[in-house]
């Protein structure tokens, strides 16, 4: 007597139904030019979403300045009242506008460098980290 095993039928499903399709586009050359199979019309459509098995391209932040705005918003939202306040190291106590302007002998960095300094509390001007816990 043969008993039907419905679980076995799942093993016979095509792999395309179980896993997402592979990224079958041809790779570009080392200098970032067009691949042999890509057309200008395909490039005009913009980047395509990649599957899990596709190429491992990291998504880049489209507007790094937005990260700075988010960091400022997090500082002023409700974390000040929690007893732990992080002070932006490049910012003087009395002036709000001088936080992103470099001083005379200071190196200038991009917005991501400023964000790293603000989130980590690192200050090149003062030569180290500065954290404040509690109230002023």
Curated annotation (Swiss-Prot):
The modification Phenylalanine amide is found at residue 133. The modification Pyrrolidone carboxylic acid is found at residue 91. GO terms for cellular component: extracellular region. Pfam families: RFamide_26RFa. Keywords: Amidation, Neuropeptide, Pyrrolidone carboxylic acid, Secreted, Signal. Residues 1-18 form the signal peptide. One of its GO terms (biological process) is locomotory behavior. GO terms for molecular function: neuropeptide hormone activity; orexigenic neuropeptide QRFP receptor binding. Ligand for the G-protein coupled receptor QRFPR/GPR103. Stimulates feeding behavior, metabolic rate and locomotor activity and increases blood pressure. May have orexigenic activity. May promote aldosterone secretion by the adrenal gland. This is Orexigenic neuropeptide QRFP. It comes from Homo sapiens (Human).
């Amino acid at each position: 007597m043969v008993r039907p095993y419905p679980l076995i039928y799942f093993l016979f499903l095509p792999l395309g139904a179980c896993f997402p399709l592979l990224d079958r586009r041809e790779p570009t050359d080392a200098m970032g030019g067009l691949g042999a199979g890509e057309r200008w019309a395909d490039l005009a459509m913009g980047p395509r979403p990649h599957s899990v098995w596709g190429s491992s391209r990291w998504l880049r932040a489209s507007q790094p300045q937005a990260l700075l705005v988010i960091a400022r918003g997090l500082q002023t939202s409700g974390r000040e009242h929690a007893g732990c306040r992080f002070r932006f190291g490049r910012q003087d106590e009395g002036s709000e506008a001088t936080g992103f302007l470099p001083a005379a002998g200071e190196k200038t960095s991009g917005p991501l460098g400023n964000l790293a300094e603000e989130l980590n509390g690192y200050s090149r001007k003062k030569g180290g980290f500065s954290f404040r816990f509690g109230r002023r």
